[in-house]
Amino acid sequence: MSKNSEDNKVFSTLGSSNHSIKERQNEDYYASDERAIAHLIIKESWLVNPDLKILEPCAGEGVLSDALYKITGNKMDLYDIVSRRNDVIQTNYFEKDFSNQYDVILTNPPYEKGSKTKPGLADMIVKMLNEVKDGGHVCLFLKVLHLESQERYEKIFKNMPPQRIHVYSKRISCYKK
């Protein structure tokens, strides 16, 4: 996802699906496959920039950040509602303000549907788009089906249509490690 200086926010989504026969963890947690980052960098070479300040708000076990570091040398700030490793700061993304701190927000977010009392995926995407620096990018690993729905159209795509969408032709599984 990109946000230009005219405050016209648009985004790019890298689609993936989870049809793994392996067990899934609680908290809507899927361990990302590190190959997902390599595929993203092939399409989005601007990520190879050590000066980028990158946030991973749904870090899980840090698979995406570890893979990005191996390939580019870029480090990410890691947050998750459940801390699964020492360098992940345990926090609820919705309870912290990250406005204008990051050039890139990159994550495989939980796919939960929100409610009146609990924010969901659409709310999370809107928060990321509003918080990324002007000229920054939001990169999400999502199932293609998340492009659908009237709610997401009204909350996100109507005013912030996707800039680029990359879809895997071969599945990369996300699973319990």
Locate predicted features.
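Class I S-adenosyl-L-methionine-dependent methyltransferase catalytic core
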Residues: M1-K177
